């Protein structure tokens, strides 16, 4: 899958670069230029001051010191003086509301549009949905066509679960023979990869990994309870979500299954992990080339009222759909999933999890930002910035934390030739900020606007779109 993505991205980028050069030469007015801006290219820890960046047909077609780049007459100009242009952010674990294709005929999709706008309004230009449905392909098409405002979507399959499934919307598989037809169907449908849950049995897990390899589909997900972290790291899985699975040591199987797999005893195991075991797990993770999407910012929402209050008090929160606001304020859905004991245990384990992230980073393991947003109570977009700041809290430098939301996801997806840095030929999924996030990660909140596939959306435009969706929902 990775090799195929890289080949397609390389050929497409080359073709679009030539097309962009032709547009610039002809003076076509369908060009946008950001002038006098400081570029944070994210190819190295550096800034490029006083740059002009020229965008056409969704690509960066020219970039250089202001005054050296010829701007065609009629090109739209955006004043970048005193501002910073960087790659757009990525949410590598999200849940956009999904429906079956047949259901979409009767569903109001304004809530979906509101979600996607919410991501864009916090600088998210790429999103990996961790539980795809057939309906998500329609959303992806509408975003790609420019009909909807939102990030580019990479869709994982519907979630594979086992006998003791947690969710009723997942695909329950107990017979390994049933796996291959499902995987073949997901590959044919165009899903990016497969998603597994901790309830999958060892024989079904093995069948999933075998079929995934045969169809060139990456596998992401939770570590199955009956497989364990060591075997999972050796299986070919590409990313582990929420750090789930590193916390199995010394926990009886019955305790792992308690509270839907979210027991106090399980989360408390973080505080019993020895430095030697931590180093062993980190080394195995690096050796296997497995990435992690920790989603720690959302864990903090569960045990830290201040974290939840910070989101609710943010000026942009009032622009969300009323249902989203109420979900965040009440956290009713999550209260039914995480017991008070398990939330307390998460709070006690949180500092150790931060240390684990730092150990992974120091060892060179792949880290990416994700939010689990779309789950009741988690607000689209907001938590991406919180997660980046959480990486900073773990001891990563601002540049390292930003990498986890820009070039790192592009490398993981095999599209680093196409995205993840600011350079000529790259896709123009970009964020324009009023201050420098390399100095302070909170600068990510100082959004001036975002380029989605080369289309400019100012913050005012994005907020107006959010207001429109909220008004429609209230009618």
Language model segments and positions:
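Bacterial N-terminal signal peptides
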Residues: 9-21
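Metal-associated gating/positioning segment near the N- to mid-region
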Residues: 84-145, 163-166, 171, 177, ...
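Acidic, glycine-enriched loop/beta-strand segments at the rims
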Residues: 39-52, 65-68, 379, 397-402, ...
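Histidine-rich, glycine-flanked metal-binding segment
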Residues: 28, 39, 44-86
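Divalent metal-dependent hydrolysis catalytic cores, especially in the metallo-beta-lactamase
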Residues: 115-134, 151-158, 185-199, 218-220, ...
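Histidine-centered divalent metal-coordination motifs
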Residues: 36, 83, 93-97, 222, ...
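Active-site neighborhoods of metal-dependent hydrolases
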Residues: 182-195, 200, 249-394, 467-470
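Boundary at the C-terminal end of the N-terminal hydrophobic targeting segment
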Residues: 22-27
